[in-house]
Each structure stands twice: as structure tokens, then as C-alpha cells.
Amino acid sequence: MARSWTKACARWKDQWPVFNEDYLDDSNGINMYAVLEHLNKTTNDNHILMTDAGSGSYICPVGLNLKSGQRLISSPSQADMGWALPASIGVAVESGRCVVPIIGDGSFMTNIQELATVSYHNLNIKFIILNNNGYLSIKNTQSKYFDGRVYGAECENGFRIPDFEGIASGFGIEYQKIEKLSDSDLISEQFLHNRPVIIDIVCRTEQEILPYQALKNGQQAGPHDMAPFLSEKIIKEEAFVDLPYVRSKE
């Protein structure tokens, strides 16, 4: 049974791959899954990969092809933004290995002061910043649940991302910006050096995280419609606004 299950998983993986050729289009920013595909080719079995909350925590478990000897460390239960930066310090010190935290731009700046420790100890940490100029995960949630209304998640509505090159310079850390997939070899070059670096990857500001749970009509039941389920009548009566009822009535 276990053997047939393993074979089935391998077949599904080949039949429905996470990465497809459409992700190579970087005309509107780099696709995050294309970033992971490059890391799959660049990292070796001595690297420890880490993820933070948000988009990285969703895409990395499905998009990274871990090699023998590699580890993927995350904090899925807490989903705490900014966790990966200080956690990577502990992992680097304890393991003595190259650590590759994959962090969103919003999460990265919540614990940015920890770069002082990274710089002081010259830790071999390669920070991969998925820079989509905002809180992409929060923006996607707001868009799906609240008819496209987005607040406090992008520059147009009260959110600001700092100049990461200036931040890196201030802490004396190497900085590399990646704006096109053709620049991906610059990431590979950074892995040749035993030093910290901030690799700032300009990603798409609009991107769905796939796969995700949804109804056949493409909608998601909102957070107001959770198990144990209330009737449609009660939801309509108790709501202060006109909430969508998209759950199947069957």
C-alpha cells in the first residue's frame, strides 16, 4: 500500500507540475514560482532553506524540490511575520551551513534590526526577498473576501516598503537586485561566497497563490461562513453588510 501510494504521488507530481512555462514571463515582474524553480537548480544538499509567513509559506512547500540533506524550516502553526530573519541566525550559528530564508518584503522589514547581528558575525545567510511591493497574501485575501477592496496592503493605500539597498548598505551587507529572470545567474554567483547577502527580487505585484481551495464557480466561502455552518437565513439576518453566500446548498 505504501509503495503504491508513493508511486501515485510521483505520478501526480509529473502529471500536474507546480511550475509551468507561463511563469517565465517576467514582463510585469518575476513570478514567485520561477524564483523557486531557479533555487531548485541553484541550491545544493548542504543548504538549509527557510520560509516566513505569507506568500513564501504557501509556495515553498509545493514549489521547492528538496534534495537529500537539505532541510526546509518554517513556522506554519504561528505564521508569525518576521520570524525567518532572526530564526535564520540561530540556524546558521548552530549548523554552520549556508542558510537561505525566503521572505516577503513585508515580513522582512518587521525584524530588520536583526541584520546587525548577521553583519557582526558575518553569517552565511542568503536572504531571498520576494519583493511584490506590499502584503501580497493579505491583498489577495482582501480582494477575494471584500469585493476587491484593499487597505493597508500596498503603496496606494498606506503601505510603504523601504529601500532595501540602503538598508543593506547601512548594515554593511552585500546587496543584489534581480529585476529579470535573465539576471538569475547573479543569484547563483552569490552562493559562491561565504557571506551574508540580501537578494532583492522584483516580483509581480499581482499573483495568485496556487493551488487553493475554492468552489467550482471560482469563489471562496468567506470567513463568516465557517463550520459548524449556520443557515443562509441566519447569516443574512445577522450580517451588518450584504455578505456573499457561496457555499453549495446541496
What are these language model-derived features?
Residues 8-94:
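Active-site diphosphate/adenylate-binding microenvironment
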Residues 58-250:
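Thiamine diphosphate
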Residues 6, 13, 247-250:
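Conserved internal helical-beta-strand scaffold that buttresses enzyme catalytic cores
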Residues 1-7:
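Terminal amphipathic helices with adjacent charged low-complexity linkers/tails
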